[in-house]
């Protein structure tokens, strides 16, 4: 509630460090300890994050990420509040990305929230998708290059947890994921590979979305295999195909 950015910064930095302290390899401030303070803590963080006056404070966003990492699934009770605030912040930074550290912790906060909530409640992916897809589509359409790897990372997470049909949003972006220019950026390769594997694990090579594009996927595999730095991603990708009962026949065809 202070009007001082310096107070915000040092308070957030202190809290973030406190949340990493361990005793006998166990967090001294675990999720049970944090539970009574969750709503008040996040309300304080987001009062700063929402404010145009205070700017993008990476220390506050890092503390937000750390708190989400510590409380894990206990954040479920205030998921709507946290997700709305994070997507609001995402919408603002998309217009003018200027603080890489802040942006990194923002996306990591979203990723931690997805993992914490959807690992215990897979059906929650629908709520996440409804709020995250609009800014994600904006990022991809506007080619905000510094954000694209993060978008692919979170999309892969959501798809991994998803229990129902993938829907048109995932179907629409699948073919563009095979575009060679996307794979030319080294920063995109790990997240893109994870996302393609998520599709393969979810649908299988015989799925109507996958089968017509299998040659494109194999092209991605061959290109990654030609690079020593990327061959691990190539083997992960081909492994996701061959792990299916119809994987070998699909590749041979």
Indicate residue ranges for each PLM-predicted region.
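Karyopherin-beta/Importin-beta family HEAT-repeat alpha-solenoid scaffold
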Residues: 1-253
